[in-house]
């Protein structure tokens, strides 16, 4: 299997269909979709199954361990993450990534650009540097190079930091690709990570 797409979800029945639909509409079909439902009390899990996702219910109350569980379940050669209120911009995202992987067989991580939306305003983020570098959903990872790297169990919004610290310490080959593939909603109250200003907090440890 080429790709595993991991979505951590928390009471996402009102918005997750757009995320799931952007995956199911992909022209490249060699993938699996994994939705890990963290402490959900609504219909998130049943909706995910409607879209062909493998699902698992957990009670971590934190984004990091939920993503870690997705990594444990994943079987694809390459890993992608998506938040439950975000989506891919095109139906050919996986097709483009597969082509880029074939063109760059040495790459361990492929970083791509994204659209950043906050308070109703959306703008493209074209260079992945500074605080935007540390965001797990704007990258595609070779699974056998992730190894033991895992997200933190913190609820402060810095769960990505130890994951990337471990990845960087491996001396992996990173390809920075200026191609927007992802639509990122910066804030939605009630999400697992409470996106707001916490998503990038603590990332200075790596910069």
Predicted regions and their residues:
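A conserved acidic beta->alpha catalytic loop
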Residues: 22, 29, 36-46, 83, ...
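Conserved donor NDP-sugar-binding/catalytic core segment of glycosyltransferases
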Residues: 87, 91-124
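Short aromatic/hydrophobic "clamp" motif used to bind/position activated sugar donors
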Residues: 79
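Conserved nucleotide-sugar donor-binding catalytic segment
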Residues: 112, 124-201
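Acidic helix N-cap motif at the loop->helix transition within catalytic regions
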Residues: 15-17, 42-50
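Short, well-formed alpha-helical segments that are part of the catalytic scaffolds
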Residues: 11-25
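Glycine-rich, basic loop-to-helix element that forms the pyrophosphate-binding segment
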Residues: 58-74
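Cell-envelope/extracellular polymer assembly enzymes that use nucleotide-activated donors
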Residues: 1-4, 22, 32, 162
């Amino acid at each position: 299997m080429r790709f595993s797409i991991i979505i951590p979800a928390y009471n996402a029945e009102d918005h997750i269909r757009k995320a799931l639909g952007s995956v199911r509409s992909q022209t490249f079909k060699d993938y699996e979709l994994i939705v890990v439902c963290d402490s959900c009390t609504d219909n998130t899990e049943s909706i995910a199954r409607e879209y062909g996702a493998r699902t698992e219910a957990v009670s971590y109350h934190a984004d990091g361990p939920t993503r870690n569980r997705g990594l444990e379940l994943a079987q694809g050669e390459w890993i992608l993450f998506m938040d439950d209120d975000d989506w891919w911009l095109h139906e050919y995202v996986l097709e483009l990534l597969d082509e880029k992987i074939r063109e760059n067989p040495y790459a361990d991580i492929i970083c791509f650009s994204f659209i950043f939306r906050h308070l109703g305003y959306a703008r493209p983020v074209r260079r992945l540097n500074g605080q935007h570098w540390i965001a797990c959903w704007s990258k595609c990872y070779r699974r056998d190079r992730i190894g033991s790297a895992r997200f933190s169990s913190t609820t402060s919004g810095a769960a990505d930091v130890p994951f990337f610290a471990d990845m960087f310490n491996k001396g992996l080959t990173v390809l920075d690709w200026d191609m927007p593939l992802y639509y990122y909603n910066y804030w939605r109250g009630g999400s697992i990570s409470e996106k707001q200003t916490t998503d990038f907090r603590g990332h200075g440890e790596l910069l």
